[in-house]
Amino acid sequence: MFRVTSVLLVIVLLNLVVLTNACHMDCSKMTCCSGICCFYCGRPMCPGTRRALLQRLVGHQR
């Protein structure tokens, strides 16, 4: 059981590292076009990105 938990933790940490690097590149722009990075660095989202995220949220609720 402990082994499974540690493997999952490593996967999550690796994803965070990759995401952080990608988001730092995205943060240099005035608006960012990938939703998670916008939350990560507090940038305003591109209008298309916001619309796509809203559509995805509405789609999941149905």
Curated annotation (Swiss-Prot):
Disulfide bond sites: 23-33, 27-38, 32-41, 37-46
Query: One GO molecular function term?
Result: toxin activity
Give the pro-peptide residues: 23-49
What does the record say about tissue specificity? Expressed by the venom duct.
Q: Which UniProt keywords apply?
A: Disulfide bond, Neurotoxin, Secreted, Signal, Toxin
Q: What is its main location?
A: secreted
How far does the signal peptide extend, from start to end residue? Answer: 1-22
Compartment(s) where it occurs, according to its Swiss-Prot or TrEMBL record: Secreted
GO CC aspect terms:
extracellular region
Task performed by this protein = Probable neurotoxin.
Similarity remark: Belongs to the conotoxin I2 superfamily.
Entry note about domains: The cysteine framework is XI (C-C-CC-CC-C-C).
Which protein are we looking at?
Answer: Conotoxin Im11.9
Q: Which organism is it from?
A: Conus imperialis (Imperial cone)
